Amino acid sequence: MGDRVAGKVALVTGAARGQGWADALRLAQEGADLIVIDVCAPLPSVVYDSATPEDLAETVRQIQKTGRRVISGMADVRDLDTLRGLVDDAARRLGRLDVVVANAGICVPKAWDQVTPKIFDDTISTNVTGTWKRLRQQRN
């Protein structure tokens, strides 16, 4: 393993399962402390099971096994105020924030002509707007 993130603090959104979980665990294995965020609730237009609080707790347990510090929180990336509060508090507690992995996203598997305006808006607001808001807020 490399040491490119050793001693750094990383934020991973969408960290309870899938790619976000894998990213968070790998960062911890490479020596980063983590802030892990996931909505852990059903989302509009999403037909598959969303991550749960138990999934996020398991992510935390796996990171703790690496010996790294971890702070978790539940937030929707579209809710900038809540996300900002969680991340700012966690970054204060961990000393800083060096890396952002804006991974949260949804997928609504439908043919293009079956995608309603609501489904489209939910997908764009989560996958694009939520990510943009998070990164923009971090810059400021």
Listing of model-derived features with the role each one plays in the protein:
Residues 2-41:
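Canonical Rossmann dinucleotide-binding motif of NAD(H)/NADP(H)-dependent dehydrogenases/reductases
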Residues 32-58:
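Conserved glycine-rich Rossmann-like NAD(P)H-binding loop of the short-chain dehydrogenase/reductase
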Residues 53-57, 74-86, 117:
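The beta1-alpha1 cofactor-binding region of Rossmann-like NAD(H)/NADP(H)-dependent oxidoreductases
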Residues 61-79:
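Rossmann-fold cofactor-recognition segment
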Residues 63, 111-112, 116-124:
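Substrate-binding pocket helix/loop in short-chain dehydrogenase/reductase
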Residues 66-69, 89-100, 108, 119:
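A glycine-rich helix->loop->beta "capping" turn
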Residues 135-136:
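A short, exposed helix-loop element centered on a Lys and neighboring polar residues
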